[in-house]
A protein has these predicted regions:
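C-terminal outer-membrane/trafficking sorting elements
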Residues: 384-461
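Bacterial Sec-dependent N-terminal signal peptides
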Residues: 1-23, 381-382, 395, 421, ...
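Short active-site loop at a secondary-structure junction
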Residues: 39-43, 68-135, 180-189, 262-263, ...
Length: 461
């Protein structure tokens, strides 16, 4: 899917601070509030929408937790609240594996027996043929999901604070028997990422959380992203509540030993940190274009899963990232929607405090539809004068761009490459700008007046 994605990368350290108009911000807030799962006590949610190089919105709804992680949430949620990201962790672990491949420490085509002790391979996993690292990454290993083992699930729910070893987790999956011959089919399995955690630790000699911190979180300045050291989260955060059913009922999973989720769901973060991570990943600032293309290539046995990355389409634009549930519901995606207002797609990240929130219908699709429909009224996209209009022509152009407005204000004109590099900046003194002499290609034209900004994708030829 690499060819579908054009991204402006202004910064992976700080998201730009320009904001949507009040009208758009209010509409996004209403989508978030309407998505709170009904029938629950004090649900909460946070969401971030980021248009690369342009606009950034974060919102919160309902309630979160402060001071203690047990009981019903009572604090008004804010957009900086932290949360357990669930299986979004898989995207980070897969990135780490590909980073290790780039440094020559492993190959994803290697058999896992090169890195794991023989008794674990032969006595516990007992696959009918060899299993590769790549098959762990894309869930074609045939090793069963530990979460599907009812005995192990009840043991975990009975005492969420007890320590779980990686080998226990592997046994919970493998003891169910091989689901299929490795490479012959597809089945989502948390056990695959437990094994990847073991391989990363074997190769690096570091704990997984240390490797993530050193190679991803710190370089990207993700100050609110970490693997917790203790069962409780000390900062303000969203809780985790799962209606499991008999005999447990509603389970408060806010306090949990992080070892239960190691390798597949143990990271804690915020919506803006997650957006920074995905922007950096897709912008090839963590791994190379070659490695990224491997992540984005769906396995033939699954039409929508690559290497630790979910790959969807929404009407018909690409939509890639990952979802997650650990007593809550999370999502982190990039849409390559391309309109005059959103020429380079957008990022969305969110978390809801209850597992099973209808996020695909109530969040992902509704946000996409709303942002796409903004094309019908571009002046409402940003704060500005009512009825403001900007015409840019001809487009494509050989160099001269005419700019016509229905208001009288000084205009600052900035031309960017599709990678976010400023090419030319000037104040419009007449009715046109001249870009003759620049290389042929696609550029982003940003037109800013006193209180509004318009963007337009232009083609020079």
């Amino acid at each position: 899917m690499k060819s579908f994605f054009t991204i402006i990368l202004v910064s992976t350290i700080t998201l730009v601070q320009a904001q949507f108009s009040n009208e758009v911000a209010d509409s996004l807030q209403k989508i978030l509030e309407a998505a709170l799962p009904p029938g629950h006590v004090n649900p909460g949610a946070v969401m971030n929408i980021y248009v690369p190089g342009e606009y950034n919105w974060s919102g919160a709804a309902g309630y979160s937790v402060s001071g203690t992680t047990t009981g019903i949430a009572a604090k008004t949620a804010v957009n900086t609240d932290q949360f357990r990201v669930g299986s979004l962790t898989k995207l980070m672990v897969a990135t780490s594996v590909l980073l290790l491949e780039e440094t020559g420490q492993l190959s994803i085509t290697d058999d896992i027996s090169l890195y794991l002790r023989s008794s674990l391979i032969n006595d516990t996993i007992q696959s009918s043929t060899g299993v590769t690292i790549e098959q762990l990454l894309n869930h074609t290993s045939g090793i069963a999901n530990a979460a599907a083992n009812q005995t192990c699930q009840q043991d975990a729910l009975s005492d969420l604070t007890r320590f779980f070893s990686l080998e226990e987790a592997v046994n919970c999956g493998a003891s169910q028997g091989e689901e299929f011959v490795p490479g012959s089919s597809w089945s989502y399995s948390n056990t695959n990422y437990t094994l990847l955690a073991m391989i990363i630790e074997e190769v690096t000699g570091q704990e997984l959380k240390t490797y993530l911190q050193t190679n991803i979180f710190v370089p990207l300045n993700l100050q609110d992203t970490y693997v917790p050291e203790s069962n409780e989260l000390t900062e303000d955060h969203l809780g985790c509540y799962w209606q499991v059913g008999f005999p447990f009922g509603l389970v408060d999973m806010s306090i949990v030993n992080p070892s239960l989720y190691k390798g597949w769901a143990d990271v804690v973060s915020t919506t803006e940190d997650l957006t920074r991570f995905l922007e950096a990943l897709l912008g090839e600032q963590i791994i190379s274009e070659v490695s990224l293309s491997k992540m984005e290539a769906p396995n033939p046995e699954s039409s929508n899963y690559g290497l630790g990355m979910e790959l969807y389409t929404i009407n018909p634009d690409g939509y890639q990232g990952h979802s997650g549930e650990v007593g809550n519901t999370s999502g982190l995606f990039y849409s390559n929607l391309s309109t005059n207002l959103i020429p380079n797609g957008y990022y969305i990240s969110y978390n809801f405090t209850y597992q099973g929130a209808s996020s695909l219908v109530d969040v992902d699709q509704k946000v996409y539809t709303y942002l796409k429909d903004l094309e019908a009224s571009p002046a409402g996209f940003l704060e500005g004068q009512e009825g403001a209009q900007v015409d840019v022509y001809p487009n494509p152009t050989s160099g001269i761009i005419n700019i016509k407005t229905n208001f009288n204000e000084v205009l600052n004109i900035n031309l960017y490459s599709t990678q976010g590099q400023l090419i030319k900046s000037e104040i419009l003194n007449g009715k046109s700008v001249n870009y003759s002499g620049l290389d042929n290609g696609i550029y982003i034209l940003s037109i800013t007046s006193e209180n509004q900004t318009f963007t337009k994708k232009i083609t020079l030829n």
